């Protein structure tokens, strides 16, 4: 399973995290598939590439609890929810077009 999670970098007593897409079986600071953002907890600074994150979430990547809260604060989960369910409501609102054959009157 592919997960969106934090990868710790930085010094002792000065944590800094990368938000990465990684296989769930790989250790925390191991290889990752793609870098989608960064998080600095000391300054409470979050930088996330919205398009990449939405791409991975649409493809089935599961965020960890911490990353989920960061995504919701950035409004990315709301955008994901709206994109998924706005398609369903649009198709439900469309009425099926019935193909009725009309008889043409012949006036001679």
UniProtKB/Swiss-Prot annotation:
Q: Does the keyword Ribosomal protein apply?
A: yes
Family, as annotated: Belongs to the bacterial ribosomal protein bS16 family.
Q: Which UniProt keywords apply?
A: Ribonucleoprotein, Ribosomal protein
| Molecular-function GO terms, alphabetical | structural constituent of ribosome
Pfam families listed in its UniProt record: Ribosomal_S16
Spell out the Gene3D superfamilies in the cross-references.
3.30.1320.10
Superkingdom per UniProt: Bacteria
Cellular compartments per GO CC? cytoplasm; small ribosomal subunit
What's the protein called, per UniProt? Small ribosomal subunit protein bS16
Which PANTHER family does the record cross-reference, listed alphabetically? 30S RIBOSOMAL PROTEIN S16 (PTHR12919), SMALL RIBOSOMAL SUBUNIT PROTEIN BS16M (PTHR12919:SF20)
What species is given as this protein's source?
A: Mycoplasma mycoides subsp. mycoides SC (strain CCUG 32753 / NCTC 10114 / PG1)
Quick one: where's region Disordered? 82-108
Q: Where is the composition biased (Basic residues)?
A: 96-108
Could you state one GO biological process linked to this protein? translation
User: What PROSITE patterns does the record tag this protein with?
Assistant: RIBOSOMAL_S16 (PS00732)
